[in-house]
Amino acid sequence: MTAQIISGTEMARTIRTALADEAAQLKADGVEPGLAVILVGDDPASHSYVKGKQKACAEVGIRSFLYTFPAAIDEETLLAKIRELNVDPAVHGILVQLPLPDHICEWSVIETIAPEKDVDGFHPINVGKMMIGQRAFLPCTPHGILVMVQSAGIDIAGKHVVVVGRSNIVGKPVGQLFLREHATVTYTHSKTPDLAAITRQADILIVAVGKARLIGPEHIKPGAVVIDVGVNRLENGKLCGDVDFDAVKEVAGYITPVPGGVGPMTITMLLHNTIEAARQLAAK
């Protein structure tokens, strides 16, 4: 058995076509969705990610504003810029590219962003609302994963979802989103003994730890859905996920590739949140 590939690239293309229509309708109503992106320092990966986000914004008709700062910027100057953007009527979403330099507190930055412009879904108010099932901006990668699984026609209710990883950005929130869809959720992490004994119970396995090819076929229940969030660069320059794709696809029922899996959906959910923020702010 060879797993069916869940292509985030194809799924994202379909969703972005619909988002472009929504953005065009907002423009026709006098509202041009705007996303402000703040980039601190000269990390090549961060610059690459931001470039991809700006390109995606242009594709669907979202105006993007890029603000770059040197790595030595002091925290208060950065927070002052965010406060300025919070009240800028042309800006509907604010994204601060992470990670930030060590001398800047990420939580101070995240908490300074107005919750109604927090299109990354990281603000404690949005996280809290997500936890209790209220309407909120959902974090982009977990939301993208949920949409991928649903769009593939996979029933979630009653399934055992195992999450490998417990980060605030992916691991913790993705489990909550699947719990809301009536899955039974188990979290695993670096301190979990006998990881394979637990992952082999998973109907849906979500891996987000940043360790190349951590998960092999011995971790997989035959026919399981395997979602690989990891992006790792090998010594030969090639990208790979946290899952040994070639080996695992012979056991799994569905699997996401790296690249071309979760990544395109993460950016697509950012676009979705920005357009939704523009719609909500325009209605006020």
Curated annotation (Swiss-Prot):
The keyword Hydrolase applies. Gene3D superfamilies: Leucine Dehydrogenase, chain A, domain 1 (3.40.50.10860), NAD(P)-binding Rossmann-like Domain (3.40.50.720). One of its GO terms (biological process) is methionine biosynthetic process. Keywords: Amino-acid biosynthesis, Histidine biosynthesis, Hydrolase, Methionine biosynthesis, Multifunctional enzyme, NADP, One-carbon metabolism, Oxidoreductase, Purine biosynthesis. One of its GO terms (cellular component) is cytosol. Its EC number is 1.5.1.5, 3.5.4.9. This is Bifunctional protein FolD. It comes from Geobacillus kaustophilus (strain HTA426). One of its GO terms (molecular function) is methenyltetrahydrofolate cyclohydrolase activity. Homodimer. Catalyzes the oxidation of 5,10-methylenetetrahydrofolate to 5,10-methenyltetrahydrofolate and then the hydrolysis of 5,10-methenyltetrahydrofolate to 10-formyltetrahydrofolate.
